[in-house]
């Protein structure tokens, strides 16, 4: 049944139930996994035995629209309870229509066992929530209204804590800045999509990196049915609660679009029309948002529209205890750490002391997938497990229940995993105490192209300038191969992958140290500076930090990009390049913690593309998103005492 037919049938179903006639279930369950069904049913049965459950509760907002919530609370009605609140654009409907069983109810079950009420709510315009969906949780007043409503529930302790990962976390920072009296603490996980501008980072919710577009939204918006509001059911006014519950058990409202090979679809030019090739509407990607803001692909990094929605930025003070969970191979570890440090530096002293961070060595939202051998991409990171449930419930017990459980005293301010040595470490700050900048300078005989070139890294600049040259062709970009990203489709795997296949290319410059005599721990920011030239009006430069093992395996650690038109910043007009001139280009800081063992090597890769993690610069100086033709760019990297292209690492001596 297609989506239009589904919604038409759903409307008939709701009308029929409202009339008092209960039809047979309309969805055909695919009971292909009896063991999973048994587990799900057992969890639901246990939950029903200890919880009062209210599903499809419609919560009114100030404009009259209603947001749908599921409420779980302990059965002992003689007490009041703090609330763990999860709000999401994703489908948390309690019934898995296709499986013919409840969804995994482990999260509310654990909350009840720990003495909490647990409320899940869909964002405006998603699933059973009314109104029009607008990306990044706007309007922010929906959060205020939901928190006020929770504080007034007769069994509520008027203390609410937030938790969630990715798009279930992105709204938390902006809401935490609003000072709602019921909101007591927050635990954002992989929350970069909620960080607009902070310090040197103008990523605007993971949309940009260094002024280049991160293409993950191209696939994510489509795969989750977020481009338009067309698929959102419009229920009859006054529809009964019974009808909503029955509809939830009969219809899967999740988007199920045809599977797309994003490695091909994202190549389409112009960028604004990528959905035309797959028969999907442009929607909020290229047309407009429901609130009338311009399509996202048409905006620049400092477009006023970014500051009119649900993104948090560093003009918004947060005075709320926070437990920040991050990962090294996430989409935006740099802005995430910058946001954490910003709150620590600007909150009141008492609240600043209540900011804690955990940084795991995994990909986006993969905290609990760590194992005895935690494989991230292709690399074994060792045993990176951490008891996140003990940490988060210990945190909530302290701040929501007022328990003197010592969680703050026994938890380090920053707990981070050092890859290579494969161990958890602790610090009072990020970067860690004792981290010192160590700079390596790029040099070559003018032929650093590919793994077989003559590029190297020195402790001091080479007096002589022998620039390395390569041709960047936007029709043949360097392909994304591992890294910190998500949501690009099955064709692209995040994490640490062997980069030697890319290092065969002539448009990839390779600079390496010799085998290290002593081990080096790099924990903290990584700053790259290049002196570049081009015959194009505008182009991009990329940088990638690599660890080379004695057998030659070259694992990517961190990567970055800079669109040269923004080399003077994002609040100024773009500036163009002129042939024959050399320009200094700095990159926003990268972040990592990695131990380079003796006999391993440090390596830097330089190029002008990393596609489709980042969109291609077509080199014309035009808007890029609305162009169908690119031109070749003949690019140069200079390195000398006059042009000290370099990489500066934060080195910690133990």
Where are each of the predicted segments found?
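Accessory cap/linker subdomain of secreted extracellular hydrolases
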Residues: 42, 104, 113, 177-179, ...
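Short beta-strand/loop motif that positions the catalytic acidic residue
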Residues: 318, 324-326
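Alpha/beta-hydrolase fold nucleophile elbow
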Residues: 154-166
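C-terminal, loop-rich substrate-recognition/catalytic regions characterized by aromatic stacking residues
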Residues: 30, 41, 237-275, 279, ...
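Proline/glycine-enriched tight loop/beta-turn segments at coil->beta junctions
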Residues: 65-68, 75-84, 156, 317-318
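Short glycine-enriched nucleophile-adjacent loop
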Residues: 169-180
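N-terminal cap/lid segment of alpha/beta-hydrolase-fold proteins
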Residues: 37-77, 512-518
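Cap/lid segment of the alpha/beta-hydrolase catalytic domain
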Residues: 78-151, 200-201, 205-207, 368-379, ...
């Amino acid at each position: 049944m297609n989506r239009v037919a589904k919604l038409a049938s759903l409307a008939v179903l709701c009308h029929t139930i409202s009339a008092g006639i209960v039809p047979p279930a309309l969805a055909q369950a695919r009971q292909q996994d009896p063991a999973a069904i048994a587990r799900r049913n057992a969890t639901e049965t246990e939950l029903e035995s200890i919880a009062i459950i209210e599903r499809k509760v419609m919560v009114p907002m100030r404009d009259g629209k209603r947001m749908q919530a599921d409420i779980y609370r302990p059965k002992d009605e003689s007490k009041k309870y703090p609330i763990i609140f999860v709000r999401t654009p994703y489908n948390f409907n309690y019934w898995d229509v296709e499986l013919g069983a409840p969804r995994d109810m482990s999260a509310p079950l654990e909350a009840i066992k720990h003495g909490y009420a647990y409320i899940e709510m869909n964002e405006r315009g998603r699933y059973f929530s009314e109104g029009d969906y607008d990306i990044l949780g706007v309007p922010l007043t929906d959060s205020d209204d939901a928190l006020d409503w929770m504080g007034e529930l007769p069994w509520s302790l008027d203390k609410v804590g937030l938790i969630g990962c990715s798009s279930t976390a992105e709204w938390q920072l902006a809401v935490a800045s609003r000072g709602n009296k019921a909101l007591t603490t927050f635990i954002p996980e992989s929350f970069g999509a909620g960080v607009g501008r902070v310090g040197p980072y103008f990523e605007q919710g993971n949309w940009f990196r260094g002024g280049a577009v991160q293409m993950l939204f191209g696939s994510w918006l489509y795969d989750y049915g977020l481009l338009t509001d067309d698929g959102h059911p419009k229920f009859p006014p006054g529809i009964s609660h019974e009808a909503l519950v029955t509809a939830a058990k009969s219809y899967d409202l999740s988007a199920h679009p045809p599977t797309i090979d994003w490695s091909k679809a994202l190549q389409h030019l112009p960028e604004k029309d990528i959905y035309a090739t797959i028969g999907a509407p442009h929607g909020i990607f290229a047309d407009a948002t429901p609130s009338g803001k311009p399509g996202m692909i048409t905006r620049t990094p400092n477009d006023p529209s970014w500051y009119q929605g649900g993104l948090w930025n560093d003009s918004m003070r947060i005075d709320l205890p926070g437990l920040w969970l991050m990962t090294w191979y996430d989409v935006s570890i740099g802005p995430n750490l910058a946001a954490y440090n910003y709150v620590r530096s600007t909150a009141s002293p008492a609240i600043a002391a209540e900011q804690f961070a955990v940084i795991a060595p995994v990909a986006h939202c993969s905290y609990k997938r760590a194992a005895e051998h935690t494989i991230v991409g292709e690399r074994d990171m060792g045993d990176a497990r951490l008891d996140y449930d003990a940490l988060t419930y210990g945190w909530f017990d302290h701040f929501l229940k007022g328990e003197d459980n010592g969680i703050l005293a026994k938890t380090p301010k920053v707990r981070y995993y050092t890859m290579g040595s494969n161990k958890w470490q602790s610090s009072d700050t990020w970067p860690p105490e004792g981290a010192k900048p160590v700079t390596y300078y790029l040099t070559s005989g003018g032929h650093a192209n590919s793994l077989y070139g003559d590029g190297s890294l020195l402790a001091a600049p080479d007096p002589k300038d022998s620039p390395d040259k390569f041709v960047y062709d936007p029709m043949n970009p360097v392909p994304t191969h591992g890294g910190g990203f998500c949501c690009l489709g099955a064709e692209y795997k995040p994490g640490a992958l062997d980069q030697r296949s890319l290092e065969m290319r002539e448009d990839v410059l390779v600079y390496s140290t010799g085998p290290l005599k002593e081990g080096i721990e790099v924990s903290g920011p990584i700053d790259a500076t290049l002196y570049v030239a081009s015959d194009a009006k505008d182009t991009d430069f990329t940088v990638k930090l690599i660890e080379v093992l004695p057998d030659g395996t070259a694992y990517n650690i961190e990567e970055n990009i800079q669109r040269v038109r923004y080399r003077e910043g994002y609040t100024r007009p773009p500036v163009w390049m002129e042939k024959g001139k050399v320009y200094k280009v700095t990159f926003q800081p990268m972040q990592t913690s990695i131990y380079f063992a003796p006999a391993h090597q440090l390596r830097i890769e330089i190029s002008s593309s990393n596609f489709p993690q980042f969109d291609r610069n077509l080199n014309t100086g035009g808007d890029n998103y609305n162009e169908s033709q690119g031109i070749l760019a003949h690019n140069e990297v200079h390195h000398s005492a006059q042009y000290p292209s370099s990489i500066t690492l934060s080195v910690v001596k133990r």
